[in-house]
A protein has these predicted regions:
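Short, charged recognition helix plus adjacent turn
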Residues: 2-15, 100-129
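Recognition helix of helix-turn-helix/homeodomain-like DNA-binding domains
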Residues: 64-80, 105-107
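The alpha-helix within a helix-turn-helix
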Residues: 49, 60, 89
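A short, Lys/Arg-rich alpha-helix, primarily the initiator
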Residues: 21-55, 134-146
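General nucleic-acid-binding
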Residues: 1-34
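Short, basic-rich loop-to-helix N-cap that marks the start of a DNA-contacting helix
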Residues: 77-91
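Short alpha-helical "recognition helix" segments of helix-turn-helix
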Residues: 55-62
């Protein structure tokens, strides 16, 4: 995958580089090579849009967020809250791992199954519920909704 003509490498690829040539990897870190830079929320969301063949306009419609707010997220001007990232996750039908990675990239707390609301959200993600279905379920168990 390319971003600004620079390859974004997976964790597995980086691990292989470390195993095969730790000295070269360490020197690259000193010189600021791109494998040293973590993904940003906009970069990860772009990858997910491509993976799920979804447009930004579809995402706007499904998240019920304003067009300007979504474009500010994609431009890196806005740092979305955990609940906004959840709305995006449900709109894109992400799985739990992709959602957890989105939280990691966005520097938000991971879903934790011992927290009642988080456990409910994980169940909804696992069942691929829509944002509306998730909202209805959360309200039915007296938990804070996403909308």
């Amino acid at each position: 995958m390319k971003e600004n003509n620079q390859e974004i490498q997976t964790t597995k690829e980086l691990f292989q580089m470390i195993q095969q040539s730790p000295g070269r990897f360490a020197n690259g870190m000193k010189s600021g090579d791109d494998f040293n830079r973590p993904l940003t929320v906009p970069q990860y969301l772009e990858q997910l849009l491509e993976k799920y063949q979804m447009s930004i306009s579809e995402l706007i419609t499904k998240t019920l967020l304003s067009k300007s707010f979504v474009y500010q997220i994609f431009s890196g001007e806005r740092n979305p809250s955990r609940d906004i990232l959840l709305r995006i996750a449900f709109a894109m039908h992400l799985n739990i791992d992709e959602t957890q990675h989105l939280f990691l990239v966005g520097q938000k707390g991971a879903l934790y199954p011992k927290v009642r609301r988080d456990a409910a959200l994980m169940c909804c993600l696992e069942q691929k519920l829509s944002l509306d279905e998730t909202e209805y379920f959360l309200k039915s168990i007296d938990e804070k909704g996403l909308l």
